[in-house]
Amino acid sequence: MDGKLIFLGLVIGILILAWVGAGVLWHAAEMAEIVAPLDPYEVEELSVMTVGTGNEYENPNRHGPSTAITLGRTVVLVDVGRGIAEGLRAAKIPLNQPSLIVLTNVLPLNTLGLDDLLMTGWLVPREERMRIVGPVGTRKLVESLEDAYAAGREALGSSLGLTPAGGRIEVTEVSDGYQEELDGLTIEARALPGGPLPTLAWRFSDGKSRIVVSGSGWGQDVLASFAGGADVLVHEAAYLPTVAELEGTGAEVAHPERLELEAEFHTSILEVGKLATQAQIDRLVLVRLRPPPFFDLQVRSLVANDYEGEIVVANDGDTVFP
């Protein structure tokens, strides 16, 4: 009897050790996903990934706005919001891989991740300057960042033997009609009028498909023309009720008058479907949603009142095209 108990104890002990070992292996694999070097990200056809889908307010489930346009091993980021390093890691895109960053404008929500990508990507390492193209105001922003980080950059680079160029930025300011070719990808900019600062929408094509990315709430007619017939439009949408609509609901808003100001600053979720219909696009990808969607169906139902194409309520890391 004692022998049986001893044997049973051994079996239980082995099972416990196996269970613990499996847990350790699983945790090790999980850690490797977080910290191990990444292979270059590569796709066979023009693709779009929503690296960050949040807006200007904090949200632990959504990083700041950034959209990755990829073709082969070429990665172009449209805007670089907060949490960009973590967003790219989750998307399995090495931080030193993006060939180009294009900005829609220099509002903080579009640029808060620039220093993060610059300095964290330098450690991968990045051997060449990080390249940024944006509207007027981009150069001043970049020069200010480089000045602010000068002492820390010098100390980090010399201590770790990093290539100096990898911690610097090559910046180009552009305006309406800008165009360039990058590894089989045609990139075009269109100025969107009517806003408080220079703003660009961006179009990408590989000769077969066309993608348009915009983040502003102004210049809608120009944007509709620029995006005309595109396969995908990546755009913001916000539901911001008026003070009158809030009256009687019991909802407490600290600064209700600011809602009206913000409504003029963003594209209403009640209007974005009309924009997509006017542009005759095949697929509308919604990002920067304000407030964040509780249920995707609610958003789709509202937008579908004015748009019959495909509606995608994107999350961080989603591949939304093809």
PLM ranges: what are they?
Residues 3-9, 16, 210, 218-317:
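Cap/insert and terminal regions of metallo-dependent hydrolase folds
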